[in-house]
Amino acid sequence: MDKKEEENLIKRINELTKISRERELTPDELEERKKLRSAFLENFRAGFRQQLEDTVVIDKDGKEVTSEKAKEAQRRKGLRKD
């Protein structure tokens, strides 16, 4: 999902939230809100996972202490040679 799509998604979620404060949402609006929220969370989680998988952790002594799970993900992406 690109930046513009995400902005539109958030805008529509916020519109539905505003409407819900003024009146009850229709069944169609409730379903739309549910789908939009699900899409937003899926995109957020994917971005967060990407960020975590690309992170290298170094302790105060300069030794890498990245988790094995993260190292494996980095190897699959071709970011690590070891």
UniProtKB/Swiss-Prot annotation:
InterPro entries reported in the protein's UniProt record: DUF896 (IPR009242)
Source taxon at top rank: Bacteria
Record-linked Pfam families: DUF896 (PF05979)
Annotated region (Disordered), positions in chain: 61-82
Entry keywords, A to Z: Cytoplasm
GO CC entries: cytoplasm
Subcellular location: Cytoplasm
Family: Belongs to the UPF0291 family.
Protein name per the record: UPF0291 protein LJ_1507
Lineage: Bacteria, Bacillati, Bacillota, Bacilli, Lactobacillales
